[in-house]
Amino acid sequence: MFTKCISCCGLAIISVFFACLFVENCAALQKTLRHYEIFHKDDVVHRVVKRGAKHSTNPFNTIKEVEFTTLGKNFRLILHPHRDVLHSKFRAYAVDADGNETVVHMDHDSFYSGRVFGELESSVRAHIEDGTMTMSIHLPEETYHIEPSWRHLPEAKKDTMVAYKASDVKVHKNEAGATPKTCGYIKEGLELEDKEHGDTLDNELHTREKRQSDQYEYTPTKTRCPLLLVADYRFFQEMGGGNTKTTINYLISLIDRVHKIYNDTVWQDRSDQEGFKGMGFVIKKIVVHSEPTRLRGGEAHYNMIREKWDVRNLLEVFSREYSHKDFCLAHLFTDLKFEGGILGLAYVGSPRRNSVGGICTPEYFKNGYTLYLNSGLSSSRNHYGQRVITREADLVTAHEFGHNWGSEHDPDIPECSPSASQGGSFLMYTYSVSGYDVNNKKFSPCSLRSIRKVLQAKSGRCFSEPEESFCGNLRVEGDEQCDAGLLGTEDNDSCCDKNCKLRRNQGAMCSDKNSPCCQNCQFMASGMKCREAQYATCEQEARCTGAHAECPKSPAMADGTTCQERGQCRNGKCVPYCETQGLQSCMCDIIADACKRCCRMSINETCFPVEPPDVLPDGTPCITGFCNKGVCEKTIQDVVERFWDIIEEINVAKTLRFLKDNIVMAVVLVTAVFWIPISCVISYFDRKKLRHEMKLIEWSQKLDLIHPSDERRRVIHIRVPRQKISVARACN
């Protein structure tokens, strides 16, 4: 009886332990998500439809229908296999402790893209393996994410998945209540002269200059950046669950979602210019370290056993790998937790011909090592020490690639760091973003301008041309006249045939699937609305012309129309409130007025709050950080950013701004400039005085009594022989 009681007590204790562990994991996930649901893979219905009797390698030959219910919504997904992000020479390898590579064979057909049934403006990116799904579902009003439960809830039932909305992702705060930095970035080295390719590059540049009297005439034809993805042993164990294929599939799915962000971006200098789009990524090689690397010769290795790494040191060690030269970019994925909650680091690209860092960079020599600075890294461990969710991983990786492509952090100006009421922060914001605000997955105008210059200058060196542009992907490419996607490949579209040609013999003038001003295969009547009004940019709604299938450029709003931040439209641009009053916009430097709208008479005048007082929206930059409910809250400075900015481009204005923003360090620096030389002089005289005193002490102990100052006086030593005295014995 006693033994039975002991057994029951033991089982109870074990049950309580695992229950507490599960609750702890749930609580950890609740720090990241406001709400989530768990469902089993058996709750998902899969249906596969074969398109024809003949086998075809066309990805649209097979349609997979997936249906399930979660988060109060029924999802019916229409999916097809796709390999957009896999290079034709794609290879994946598992690497052991001695560096031996083993080829890993992958099922490329487990990656899907598609749409939600009945939702015209929807898109889906998914990976399905043994019924367990990792996917992102984009709808006009919300984005849904699904991923395996084990990644965040180790004690959850096997074969279950976590579902959550993008709007339920929390923005993390650090101990001081500020939003932590997403990453740092590095500008390494100065201009390097690549003698071997100098003449070739000069000719290339000269030819391009002649071709680019208008810079918008040049559109890159090589649009894919080949990637090397490396997972260290920590990432393999934590995010891959100790399974090589799971790790590889996670990375492919991640890059697939990041590729969509880039591929849909129009790289332009100004909104009234066309720019170019379709720039993205393709994975050429994946390396997964299944165990820590054994060190040889005492050299540090990015995959060695080390509990704590400085993030910058880790990136530099990773950049020593010779194989990086064969790729556009190399990226390391780790599960290390870095100081300050940093989630990533990358070298910044530059449009200058021989600068190092970012895409298509020449090699760089530093401290006896050859570095390949087309690199970056991301961590899957946030500042809480928890694994990042899919949404966070997407944004962090996209952010680091943005640095590699040439963008620095968005400056604190309204154009590139708008408030939440104006769409929120953009992708390249210094601090982490939730991913829910409309701008969080977009590049700011500042980033667009920077990256565009780098792409035009360097993409031709190491990018590759798209290998699979095929009929049926809803994109009009090459000699296609239209592309109706899924319906078109079944020859069921009334405007576009299965060969992506317009059905002109049936009177088709355009395709409803590809042109906003096309309806029933005909140009829409003149005056039909095709684009909504944009008050933030002072653009009216656009209407079809009746003669073309494309939506024309939006006309400017009438002068005097109210636009963002109480401004007014003038000549098609939103003029800030202060300028409409004949004043200049500025930022009050008095804390009490820091979150009020302020103006000044001229550039050298003092800022003053307008009357009646106008409190700035939450998220607006202020003198020490960002406004929150009318109070200017201090945030952490991005020291790495400012430091490398100054080294890269030293000028008086930037130096003064740096000193002003870092007043404590400035005081220490200025004090040191004066104190160190003075200390050296004082120390010199102290030592001289000490030597003099030591000589005096030494003189006082001598017998010749010659003062040290009498150096010219000669001392003559006279040796006097002593007389020997003999003692005679008397003999009696």
UniProtKB/Swiss-Prot annotation:
* Stretches the record annotates as Crambin-like: 598-662
User: What EC designation does it have?
Assistant: 3.4.24.-
- Report how it sits in the membrane: Single-pass type I membrane protein
Which residue ranges make up the pro-region? 29-211
Q: Name one GO biological process term.
A: positive regulation of programmed cell death
Which is one GO molecular function term here?
metal ion binding
Gene (UniProt):
Tace
> Which species expresses this protein natively?
Drosophila melanogaster
Cofactor binding annotation: Binds 1 zinc ion per subunit.
Where in this protein would one find the motif Cysteine switch, according to its record? Answer: 181-188
Q: Tell me which InterPro entries the record gives.
A: ADAM10_ADAM17, ADAM17_MPD, ADAM_Metalloproteinase, Disintegrin_dom, Disintegrin_dom_sf, MetalloPept_cat_dom_sf, Peptidase_M12B
Name its cellular compartments.
Membrane
Q: Kindly report the protein's main subcellular placement as a broad class.
A: membrane
List, separated by semicolons, the cofactors it needs: Zn(2+)
Q: Where is this region: Disordered?
A: 196-217
- The protein in question is named ADAM 17-like protease
List the transmembrane segments: 663-683
Q: What class of enzyme is it?
A: hydrolase
The residue ranges of the Peptidase M12B domain are: 223-467
| Biased composition, class Basic and acidic residues, residue ranges | 196-214
